[in-house]
Every structure is written in structure tokens, then in C-alpha cells.
Amino acid sequence: MLSGGKKNNADVTDTVKDQVYKSKDELKKQWGNNYENNLKKIEEAVSKTAGQVLTYDGKPISASFFSTSNGRTENAADYWGNDYPYLKSVDSPWDQASPKFTSEQTFTVADFQKRLGVKVLADGKVGNIKDLTEGKRVKDVAFQGKTLTGKEVREKLDLRSSDFTWKQQGDKIIVTTKGFGHGVGMSQYGANGMAAEGKKYTDIVAHYYKGVEIKTMNDYEGKLMVKK
């Protein structure tokens, strides 16, 4: 939603593009013997925070989140082009313990060129990473006569993150990424790491969403309207 796009005229989808939804049967299959315990934790968290809203400057925020950072979160403006004062780059060192912290993907040179619409030089120079964002992700990559943003490269190659490096080996290009997701807002593995250190949920949201306040729905009684 923060990117401003729609899918099949819907504002929200049940995929990683917005928010994954899984039925209880799917969760039972995924969690196995841990299903009851995990579900209890979720229900308890929902119950204890019922009616609470994250706000900035008196208005509910767009609380974006993702799986795993590269050690820092990303500025919303650097990834989506839309600036949100509470979605700023912050340290997130706990993510290094995530099984999704690093990964590799291999492409043929032909597939790589086709997906990006570029040419790879014969000397093995795949492309020149020109700039990094504050969140240490790729901002721009220069190819022969063409420049792509890190976000564009990530989406065209279906990479886990826009923090990437690459090398050519023969007719293959190996891409190494750090992190998993767009990187904006709260890292789920980072939040879990903070919780494991004894931090409260109020500490966690204050770290990832700068300058926010927690309000209750009672504060907005009579102020919220359903959009028809």
C-alpha cells in the first residue's frame, strides 16, 4: 500500500506484497506439534494490545514490516519514493541470527540480461553499483547505457533484498543478498531478537517506528469513518 500500487483493483492482497494470510489448516501443517502453543501466543498478543493504535502526529501510521534486515532498516523514501517521518533507517543487529540473513541465487548470463534488459561485458564486469542508500542497500546500478535502481533490480530478478553483490563465473552470474524483504519499518527477526533480550513491545515499536505514540481506539471514537 505504501508503494501506491494496486493488484486486481484491491488495496491489500494476501501475499508478501501486503500481508500473508494462512488458514488454520495451513498453520497446523506448517507448525505441526507447535500449533497450539504458537496460536496461544498470537491470541495472547492480540488480546493484550486490543484497541491500541500506533500514531504519528496524532494520526494512525502505516506500520510496514518485513522478515529480515541486512543489519539496518531502510528509509521509506529510498525504497518507495514516498517519505514517512517515522519510517527511517535504524540499526537492527539482531537479524544476523536469522536463517534468511544471507542467500545466493544463480542466473545464466542470458537470463540475467533478458530480465534486466542490459548487456554484460565480456570482461566479467556485470554492472557498476554507483550508490548505496542510508540502509546500506543498492541505490543505483549503471550498465552500458542504462541505469537501474536497486529496487528495480531486486524486482526484476526476484531477489530477497536490494542489498546485493554479484560475480560472473563463466556463463553464470551469482548474486549474493543480505536480508529478506523491502527493509522498511519493523524487522520481524529484529523484533524477535529484541524480545529475546527482554525488551517490551513498546520498546520494539519505538525503535523501529521513530517518534510514534501508542493511542487507544477510544481516542478516535467518532473521528474514524469507513470509506465507501
PLM region spans:
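Extended substrate/cofactor- or partner-recognition/assembly subdomains adjacent to catalytic sites
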Residues: 1-172
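C-terminal soluble interaction/assembly domains
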Residues: 144-228
